[in-house]
Amino acid sequence: MAAMAVGGAGGSRVSSGRDLNCVPEIADTLGAVAKQGFDFLCMPVFHPRFKREFIQEPAKNRPGPQTRSDLLLSGRDWNTLIVGKLSPWIHPDSKVEKIRRNSEAAMLQELNFGAYLGLPAFLLPLNQEDNTNLARVLTNHIHTGHHSSMFWMRVPLVAPEDLRDDVIANAPTTHTEEYSGEEKTWMWWHNFRTLCDYSKRIAVALEIGADLPSNHVIDRWLGEPIKAAILPTSIFLTNKKGFPVLSKVQQRLIFRLLKLEVQFIITGTNHHSEKEFCSYLQYLEYLSQNRPPPNAYELFAKGYEDYLQSPLQPLMDNLESQTYEVFEKDPIKYSQYQQAIYKCLLDRVPEEEKETNVQVLMVLGAGRGPLVNASLRAAKQAERRIRLYAVEKNPNAVVTLENWQFEEWGSQVTVVSSDMREWVAPEKADIIVSELLGSFADNELSPECLDGAQHFLKDDGVSIPGEYTSFLAPISSSKLYNEVRACREKDRDPEAQFEMPYVVRLHNFHQLSAPKPCFTFSHPNRDPMIDNNRYCTLEFPVEVNTVLHGFAGYFETVLYRDITLSIRPETHSPGMFSWFPIFFPIKQPITVHEGQNICVRFWRCSNSKKVWYEWAVTAPVCSSIHNPTGRSYTIGL
């Protein structure tokens, strides 16, 4: 009946639903809503004014059907086109025991009937501070039966009483909530999902009002699992031609919600009576088509959003051909390397020596040859002579290098099949070039590799890169917390998955504070006693009530002089997609209040066979130390 079902947001088309409080003829209404262009219908499963009695006789045993028959629609239509709504008279957190008990029974009846119909989602309101019993009833329902419905918690962006303009100055307030208006509704949601133990089946349907809260409050909401945005018709303005439009600030919020692929629900009556109701939906389609286009990084990362991957271990494992292929497609990385090598050659070889001075250049970890090609292009560009060694430990990639040499490079390049730490070089290098960096800079053991190879670098020799620094930032993300929790393995400690980092394209998250530098490594390392173990303490100020789920890791590197690469958001190399950020989770979410500092301790540890990280939060409260002795995660030397 409709082009797209509930949960089918994707592509360039807006997925949308119509919210109605009363639906006398369900099949006719569904047909009319589909004709207007909507994909699904939000409606009460029971008549909203039919207050059932579950406790007292004789009303308890009133005869007749409780609601309409499921035969009015096909199973497929119930499964894909209807979102259920709880009857408005149900108050499971009422202080009046009779109302509470009756509401519990009615709520379970409606949820069970929704499960019987196979509804894809069910809307439940969060409109007060105390929702503890609502959480209990819903959690009990989720843990019984084999249904798979999602539960969308309808949360206003700003609490309704905070929008009243008739509040008398100095009048006593009836509530004792400790949070300001724009903080309040997020706290309702945060407490509710905590009571429900972060269930993956409970998500947010965010109701947008005419007034928006401050930007940091919106940023925080965008780190939550928002599945739907509810837009009342009353918030739409009217343009010169009489069509509904949204204000500029609301448009910006819609653009951000579109990035999260939320579904939109239009609620309320037509406030633009000269126009068809579908004009609200047409305006959303217009916004979708006119939003800023995705950049190269977003296009490359499509489909990888919030998808956890284990960091590569190229020192311990031999990479596959497809992995090399992905990295080689990066348009920025190798042009920056070429520029760095070009500048280095010009600095080391004056114009008058360009015919006689042959620079020895070693590519350490040559892979399938992209850095070799970048080096040859740089030498040609600089009009300088080089003799090149391509050192690679992966015997499979060496096959590719030898083919390159036979077909293209010739005697200018010597291919060496060896671990760089064990290779006995026939001569010393003027320049060593490597691409051994991971998402957290040193997490693919670049320091150990380059330290082991620097004995064949001349005393005045140059390493490209010359320096790299890791960065950490605290983040909040229900999505990532649940993804990590789902990574539990049968024969391991039940919390081992929280003691390892993950490479991930961060998407549905909120960064709580700007990244700060963690560990820095420089090459060549001339210290008489080289020690790559590290320890740092980082403090992050937090300006909003929030919850901490872990830390995002980034890096910056100086290839040579002013030539850099970065995945830190503030300095990200435009168009570069070789690295996604890294994520260090924590076992238990930590509530953080506005004005508090987050303090994290980070260690880089090693022994003769492996390297690992340990981490712990020490403020605002202490967590346990994660990954002691590398018990859950190590990087093999």
UniProtKB/Swiss-Prot annotation:
Keyword Transferase belongs to the record: yes
UniProt-annotated stretches for the region Dimerization: 488-494
Name of this chain's protein: Protein arginine N-methyltransferase 5
Sequence positions bearing N-acetylalanine: 2
SUPFAM superfamilies: S-adenosyl-L-methionine-dependent methyltransferases
Limits of the SAM-dependent MTase PRMT-type domain: 308-615
Catalytic activity: L-arginyl-[protein] + 2 S-adenosyl-L-methionine = N(omega),N(omega)'-dimethyl-L-arginyl-[protein] + 2 S-adenosyl-L-homocysteine + 2 H(+)
Subunit composition and interactions: Forms, at least, homodimers and homotetramers. Component of the methylosome complex, composed of PRMT5, WDR77 and CLNS1A. Found in a complex composed of PRMT5, WDR77 and RIOK1. RIOK1 and CLNS1A associate with PRMT5 in a mutually exclusive fashion, which allows the recruitment of distinct methylation substrates, such as nucleolin/NCL and Sm proteins, respectively. Interacts with PRDM1. Identified in a complex composed of methylosome and PRMT1 and ERH. Interacts with EGFR; methylates EGFR and stimulates EGFR-mediated ERK activation. Interacts with HOXA9. Interacts with SRGAP2.
Cysteines paired by S-S bonds: none
Regions crossing the membrane: none
Family statement drawn from the similarity comment of this UniProt entry: Belongs to the class I-like SAM-binding methyltransferase superfamily. Protein arginine N-methyltransferase family.
GO biological process entries: circadian regulation of gene expression; DNA-templated transcription termination; gene expression; Golgi ribbon formation; negative regulation of transcription by RNA polymerase II; peptidyl-arginine methylation; positive regulation of mRNA splicing, via spliceosome; spliceosomal snRNP assembly
GO terms under cellular component: cytoplasm; cytosol; Golgi apparatus; histone methyltransferase complex; male germ cell nucleus; methylosome; nucleus
Gene encoding the protein: Prmt5
Domain of life of the organism encoding this protein: Eukaryota
Alphabetized GO MF terms: chromatin binding; E-box binding; histone H2AR3 methyltransferase activity; histone H4R3 methyltransferase activity; methyl-CpG binding; methyltransferase activity; protein heterodimerization activity; protein-arginine N-methyltransferase activity
TIM barrel, as annotated region: 13-292
Keywords of the record: Acetylation, Biological rhythms, Chromatin regulator, Cytoplasm, Golgi apparatus, Methyltransferase, Nucleus, Repressor, S-adenosyl-L-methionine, Transcription, Transcription regulation, Transferase
Record-linked Pfam families: PRMT5, PRMT5_C, PRMT5_TIM
UniProt lineage: Eukaryota, Metazoa, Chordata, Craniata, Vertebrata
Binding site for a protein: 327, 435, 444
Residues forming the catalytic site: 435, 444
Principal location: cytoplasm
Region (Beta barrel): 465-637
Assigned EC number: 2.1.1.320
Coiled coil: none
UniProt: S-adenosyl-L-methionine binding residues: 324, 333-334, 392, 419-420
Regulation of activity: Activity is increased by EGF, HGF, FGF1 or FGF2 treatments, and slightly decreased by NGF treatment.
